[in-house]
Amino acid sequence: MMPFDFTADISVEDASALAKNLGINHSEISIKEMFESFNKGLSKSFEGLETDKTEENLQSRCRGVTLMALSNKLGYLVLTTGNKSEAAVGYSTLYGDTAGGFSVLKDVSKTLVYELSNYRNIISNVIPQRIIESCLLYT
């Protein structure tokens, strides 16, 4: 997990619960220093400009760079989380959300992702409901 200043504690708790429910080992890696380095490096180019989505997208890109470095070092394959609906409308951060070797949900619509998530939870609550509900806020 790579929380940042704006990551709610409850989001970290839910992600940890999901990893535990799936039997996935996880750790927490700070992206704060990397993010600050990017901002410092870009400060002259951004001078006089308002803070906007650019800085928010840098967080995602820091996560993507970190995941790709771990992938290269450890021989893992990074899976992206984008789905068919997001790809169709361009709702993603290039080199952030899209950083990875395979998109498991590439042919699955966002509506079906929610249906599959809820279906998976019928037998046992593997995916914390707050994760599903919070994703609905960004549609």
Each predicted region: which residue ranges?
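Active-site adenylate/phosphate-handling loop in enzymes that bind or generate adenylated species
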Residues: 22, 45-122
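A conserved beta-strand->alpha-helix junction
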Residues: 1-54, 60, 130-136
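Long, low-complexity, charged/polar intrinsically disordered regions in eukaryotic proteins
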Residues: 114, 122-134
